[in-house]
């Protein structure tokens, strides 16, 4: 499999999701423009799913269908899955993570599974707190770190630190929140705007 690039938006929303619910397992879907085999997979966005209903298949089906429709309209595909375990020192994908990632890989063979490393998930991490896995046959194995690219790691690091200090994670909406109150926006356009504005303020353009 080829290179994977993680955007500031995708990385930021994963971290904010885990930070909003630090004592719970959280998960979500990774989105990317459709690519041909061998091309760089650019993870441009993510959709936070659950923090309390992770194992409820009915809820998952509803979420997957809605995200797939929305992503298609935006010219994107569901290209992966992210998961943070509730236990601080557990970075291994459990049965649920493997099941959902495997299902995504059935439709998108180049899909990746990202496990968040809770120990490294601090306001100002020195290294990316993520473990990227790829599907090889029937197993998910760590991807060669030389093939995991960052559009701008330092910018992503600074942005997430600033957002966390500003408590932006309190405004993140996952699908659980949306199911409790359908007025809440699981696409997180408000947060997307904050991320875009932050990036624009650092490089001179939005």
UniProtKB/Swiss-Prot annotation:
Organism domain of life: Eukaryota
Subcellular location: Endoplasmic reticulum membrane
GO cellular component terms, semicolon-separated: cytoplasm; EMC complex
Residue spans crossing the bilayer: none
Domain MPN span(s) in chain numbering: 4-139
PROSITE patterns associated with the record: MPN (PS50249)
Keyword Membrane appears in the UniProt entry: yes
Quaternary structure note: Component of the ER membrane protein complex (EMC). EMC8 and EMC9 are mutually exclusive subunits of the EMC complex.
Role of this protein: Part of the endoplasmic reticulum membrane protein complex (EMC) that enables the energy-independent insertion into endoplasmic reticulum membranes of newly synthesized membrane proteins. Preferentially accommodates proteins with transmembrane domains that are weakly hydrophobic or contain destabilizing features such as charged and aromatic residues. Involved in the cotranslational insertion of multi-pass membrane proteins in which stop-transfer membrane-anchor sequences become ER membrane spanning helices.
Protein name as it appears in the record: ER membrane protein complex subunit 9
């Amino acid at each position: 499999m080829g290179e994977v690039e993680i955007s500031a938006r995708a990385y930021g929303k994963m971290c904010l999701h885990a930070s909003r619910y630090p004592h719970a397992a959280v998960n979500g879907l990774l989105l990317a423009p459709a690519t041909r085999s061998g091309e760089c997979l650019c993870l441009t966005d993510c959709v936070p799913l659950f923090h309390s209903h992770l194992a409820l298949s009915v809820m998952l089906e509803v979420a997957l269908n809605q995200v797939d429709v929305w992503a298609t309209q935006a010219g994107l595909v569901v290209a992966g899955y992210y998961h943070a375990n509730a236990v601080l020192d557990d970075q291994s994908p459990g049965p649920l993570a493997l099941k959902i990632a495997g299902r995504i890989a059935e439709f998108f063979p180049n899909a990746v599974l990202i496990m968040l490393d809770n120990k490294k998930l601090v306001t100002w991490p020195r290294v990316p707190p993520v473990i990227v896995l790829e599907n090889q046959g029937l197993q998910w194995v760590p991807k060669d770190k030389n093939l995991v690219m960052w559009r701008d790691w330092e910018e992503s690091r600074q942005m997430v630190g600033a957002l966390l200090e500003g408590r932006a994670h309190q405004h993140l909406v996952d699908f659980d929140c949306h199911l409790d109150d359908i007025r809440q926006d699981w696409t997180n356009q408000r947060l997307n705007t904050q991320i875009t504005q932050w990036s624009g303020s650092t490089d001179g353009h939005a």
